[in-house]
Amino acid sequence: DRLQGRAMSGVKEPGKAADPIIVHPDVRRMLLTQKAFVEGGRVLCFLTGREIDSAHLNPDPQARQASNDLIAFLTPIVKGFLTEAAMEVTSLAVQVHGGHGFIRQTGVEQLMRDARITPIYEGTNGVQALDLLGRKVFGTGGKSQQMIAARIVDSIKKFGGMPEIAPLAADLGKRLEQWGRLTAELGLAAKGNPDEVGAAAVDYLRVVGH
């Protein structure tokens, strides 16, 4: 609701001294980035929670094992990627508020400080990233990646025909191919130098999380 400046595309609130900051493109960019991370993160958590229920309650032993395999793959992503996303989201929240975001008046700075500890406890994100790339991807011979990739392909086939979804589905398909190439390249590099896994793990986790 804060009034500050005028919209580049023209005055939006002529009866007021200035326009709300939400009309400014950069503010909208930051808000939409936060929205994407928060809503996407919730869906990822819901998906993981559903698989946990399936692993405990599904009467089919094969289905329970499939859920356990998926949980093992998703856990370092949920912990590692979403905690880094929390830092970015809260940092953007401070930025949206400007100087008032940095002081205690709004409470936003407390959210940012609270988020900062999350990449550290319960296994640092570096450890989570090593778990993902070293154990869940390379350690399974790529089976875990193939499992999640197959699910993504099924979703693309299922929803790709919807006009409003088609561009996103096509882009997701490209990202899936890039992920496969990235993993293959890292696998070759790691054979020559195992330290490549540790050096690339955190960035790899971020790529997979996105």
Question: Where does each model-flagged region fall?
Answer:
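Flavin-dependent oxidoreductase catalytic core characteristic
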Residues: 1-210
